[in-house]
Swiss-Prot record:
The keyword Metal-binding does not apply. One of its GO terms (molecular function) is DNA-binding transcription factor activity. Keywords: Activator, DNA-binding, Transcription, Transcription regulation, Virulence. This is Invasion protein InvF.
């Protein structure tokens, strides 16, 4: 297989199935047939943005290659999203030099940066229109970008993120209901309580009491 980008050319021998990550490169078979299946990397970019946001791995900037070729042991992992995510997490724990290059490529993608931006804004209480203006694109285009990066509707995703973060703080017991509502972008304590109850079936106060009883 031949890779070409600008004036740089490189050949690579592929005897079995392989996974190719590439950025704006021309790929062509030198001999034989090339059978390929495109895969959406937004799932991996999103997962990586969460991991990096939690500070779980070293994100020191590294210059990425224009393409990276991996040969996973089990090709079946790419047939199932959960298997794919599990494989990805395993690789992050003990990354090979080649996989570190994959991470560098993913960190250059717009989906990765957009998910990071949305995570940072998830408790701001800003509307999607306000976020789009801050991001510098039209509301319609911003929704389209978010849908592609998140794999679903951004409004629902942000709502769930905000709920998760506020519940973690509620369970830890560091803030009262009013503080939680203000700090996580809810319009009022009643708005906070009603939304949590709508999403998980119990109020945050009741959930906190249940957890405290379980700890005794």
């Amino acid at each position: 297989m031949s890779f070409s980008e600008s004036r740089h050319n490189e050949n690579c021998l592929i005897q079995e199935g392989a996974l190719l990550f590439c950025e704006q490169a021309v790929v062509a078979p030198v001999s034989g047939d090339l059978v390929f299946r495109p895969l959406k990397i937004e799932v991996l970019s999103k997962l990586l943005a969460f991991i990096d946001g939690a500070g779980l791995v070293d994100t020191t900037y590294a210059e990425s290659d224009k393409w990276v070729l991996l040969s996973p042991e089990f090709r079946a992992i790419w047939q199932d999203r959960k298997r794919c995510e599990y494989w990805f997490l395993q690789q992050i724990i003990t990354p090979s030099p080649a996989f570190n290059k994959v991470l560098a490529l993913l960190r250059k993608s717009e989906s990765y940066w957009l998910v990071g931006y949305l995570l940072a804004q998830s408790t701001s209480g800003n509307t999607m229109r306000m976020l789009g203006e801050d991001y510098g694109v039209s509301y319609t285009h911003f929704r389209r970008l978010c849908s592609r990066a998140l794999g679903g509707k951004a409004k629902s995703e942000l709502r769930n993120w905000r709920m998760a973060q506020s519940l973690l703080n509620s369970v830890e017991g560091h803030e009262n209901i009013t503080q939680l509502a203000v700090n996580h972008g809810y319009s009022s304590p009643s708005h906070f309580s009603s939304e949590i109850k709508e999403l998980i079936g119990v109020s945050p106060r009741k959930l906190s009491n249940i957890i405290q009883l379980a700890d005794k």
